[in-house]
Regions:
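N-terminal glycine-rich phosphate-binding loop and ensuing alpha1 helix
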Residues: 2-49
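Short beta-strand-to-loop acidic/aromatic patch adjacent to the donor-nucleotide binding site
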Residues: 86, 90-101
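Acidic donor-binding segment of Leloir-type glycosyltransferases
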Residues: 38-70
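Conserved nucleotide-sugar donor-binding
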Residues: 91-92, 136-149, 193-197
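Basic phosphate/pyrophosphate-binding loop/patch that engages nucleotide-derived ligands
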Residues: 88, 111-122, 141-157, 167
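Conserved donor-nucleotide/metal-binding helix-loop-beta segment in metal-dependent transferases, i.e.
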Residues: 84, 105-130
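Conserved donor nucleotide-binding strand/loop of the catalytic core
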Residues: 64-77, 87
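Conserved alpha/beta core of the MobA/IspD/sugar-nucleotide pyrophosphorylase nucleotidyltransferase superfamily
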Residues: 140, 159-240
Length: 240
């Protein structure tokens, strides 16, 4: 079964432009994320899906240097970008990751894929009530992706890719992967300068000691240094 990770990435972010190529310790956030994604066991290719615009040429150049596949499509119609990329790379199952999650845990991705395969759901996502923002994983079939691409023209569905799935539970079986963890109050995503500040602190403290640090290591670090999480505690997650 060809299970591919597709990462959506672009430079033209409204709240923090160029965030995916912001650097910590001489490496971009996208490099850190791709390094982590390469440790996922249950997948084949990693594909970075960006836009057709020249502003995103540096993303493609970075991926070329790192030998990571890319696809270029619509900026606003992200659903079509995913659908086209999945067909081009012959994916049967898609793992959706966004580039604003640079510290995504590869072991969490593997466990989510295992859960999806074992339980035969149409769509699986990590539980937002369990994990920090920034540990967001979605798994679904390319067939479902093509169905959504053909059947919905709602702007929210086109921009955010997967609302069509979880807003139609009568048509699709929806699964949520969770563990015995209460960490949803932390923000490990990068939407704002404050978010970047926290990620910078974590990378500077964790990466030099252990390039393969995981979510457990991050949480231990935040529990030991609770003041760090105050940096972006006030940031409100955008509602879809």
């Amino acid at each position: 079964m060809s299970t591919h990770i597709i990462v959506q990435a672009r430079m033209n972010s409204s709240r923090l432009p160029g965030k995916v190529l912001k650097e910590v310790l001489g490496k971009t956030l996208l490099e850190y994320q791709l390094e982590r994604l390469k440790r996922v066991i249950n997948t084949g290719k990693i594909i970075v899906a960006t836009t057709i615009y020249p502003i995103d040429d540096p993303i493609v150049a970075l991926c070329n240097r790192l030998s990571v596949s890319t696809y270029r499509g619509s900026e606003s119609d992200v659903l079509s970008r995913y659908a086209e990329a999945s067909i081009l790379f012959l994916s049967q199952t898609v793992v959706r990751i966004t580039a604003d999650c640079p510290l995504i845990d590869p072991m969490l991705i593997d466990r989510t894929i295992d859960f999806y395969r074992r339980c035969s759901f149409d769509y699986v996502s990590t539980d937002h009530a369990t994990y920090p923002r920034g540990m967001d994983v979605e798994v679904f079939s390319t067939d479902m992706l093509q169905m959504a691409n053909s059947n919905t023209m709602q702007p929210t569905d086109r921009e955010h890719v997967t609302p069509y799935f979880y807003q139609n539970p009568d048509r699709f079986s929806i699964g949520t992967y969770s563990e015995d963890l209460q960490a949803s109050h932390y923000r490990l995503t990068v939407d704002t300068p404050e978010d970047f500040q926290l990620i910078q602190i974590l990378l500077e403290n964790l990466y030099p000691k252990n390039h393969k640090f995981n979510l457990e290591d991050i949480l231990k670090c935040l529990q030991k240094n609770p003041q760090w999480s105050y940096v972006n505690q006030h940031i409100v997650q955008k509602i879809i």
